[in-house]
From Swiss-Prot:
Disulphide bridges: 31-99
Signal peptide extent: 1-7
Species this chain originates from: Mus musculus (Mouse)
GO BP: any one term: adaptive immune response
Region V segment, annotated ranges: 8-103
GO CC terms of this entry: plasma membrane; T cell receptor complex
Protein name as it appears in the record: T-cell receptor beta chain V region C5
């Protein structure tokens, strides 16, 4: 019950939940958190694979590259909002994208995940 209550308090939302984009088009995925967390993350998940970190941020107005940043930009205009931008979407960027937030960014710190955004690039 404690985990459920904690989860309900730690809201991370994403928009859109699904999107179809054309190759070469610009795509912006938005994430909003009400946790007052310093750290925010964008991951991608491909079929049959685990999560891979694209970009993260530990403070507003600053972003850092993750493990697979190529082809992506990120923007953290405020504590609550963290966007992932594909300037020129490509077929290889078809995936499910997850945003998460955490308090300290430590290895043992819980990350709270959004519901995911399914992106299909045609």
């Amino acid at each position: 019950i404690l985990l459920c209550a904690k989860h309900m308090e730690a809201a991370v939302t994403q928009s859109p939940r699904s999107k179809v984009a054309v190759t070469g088009g610009k795509v912006t995925l938005s994430c909003h958190q009400t946790n007052n967390h310093d750290y925010m993350y964008w991951y991608r998940q491909d079929t049959g694979h685990g999560l891979r970190l694209i970009h993260y941020s530990y403070v507003a107005d600053s972003t850092e590259k993750g493990d697979i940043p190529d082809g992506y930009k990120a923007s953290r205009p405020s504590q609550e909002n963290f966007s992932l931008i594909l300037e020129l979407a490509s077929l290889s960027q078809t995936a499910v994208y997850f945003c998460a937030s955490s308090g300290t960014g430590g290895a043992l710190d819980t990350q709270y995940f959004g519901p995911g955004t399914r992106l299909l690039v045609l």
